Amino acid sequence: MNERDQVLKAAADLVSAFAGNDREAYFGAFSADASFVFYTLEQPLLSRDAYQVLWDTWRSEDGFEVLACTSSNAFVSLQGDVAIFIHDVATELRMQGEQHFSQERETIVFKKQASGQEQQGLWLACHEHLSAMPEGLPPP
C-alpha cells in the first residue's frame, strides 16, 4: 500500500472509531502530544489527554454519544513524514438528550512514526482542526 493510501486508511479508521464511539481506538489514532482546535471551544486542547478528559466529561455530564459520522471529499497532501488530510464531515450526535447534526470541514495532520518508536511506520494524527462549514453549501 502506498503512503497516500496508508494515510487514507488511517483517516478512515479514525472516523470509523469516532462514529462507533470506540474511545480506545479513536484516541489511539492520535499521538500523545496531539493538539486539537475546535471552533466550538474557546481554547485549543494541547494534548490527547486534555481531549480525553473533555470527552469523558461530555459523556458523564452531557450524555455525549456519536450516532453517525461520514467523511467525504477527502484530499491528502504528503510532505515527507507528515501528511495533511482534509475532508468534509457530517456528524450526528446526542448531547443532553437532544440530537444534533453538523456539517463541518476538518484538517487532520498525520505524522509517520519513526523507527524505534512503539508504533513504527504507522500514521498517527498529531493535529486536528475542525471548522464550521461555510454557509450556503449544499449537504454532501
What are these regions (language model features)?
Residues 14, 55, 71-76, 89-91, ...:
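Hydrophobic/aromatic beta-strand elements that line small-molecule binding cavities or substrate pockets
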Residues 92-100:
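Short, cysteine-centered beta-strand-loop-beta hairpins and adjacent loop/turn segments enriched
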Residues 35-37, 84, 124:
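General beta-strand recognition
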Residues 36, 45, 92, 116, ...:
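Flexible, glycine-rich phosphate/dinucleotide-binding loops
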Residues 1-29, 136-140:
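Short, low-complexity N-terminal intrinsically disordered segments enriched in polar/charged residues
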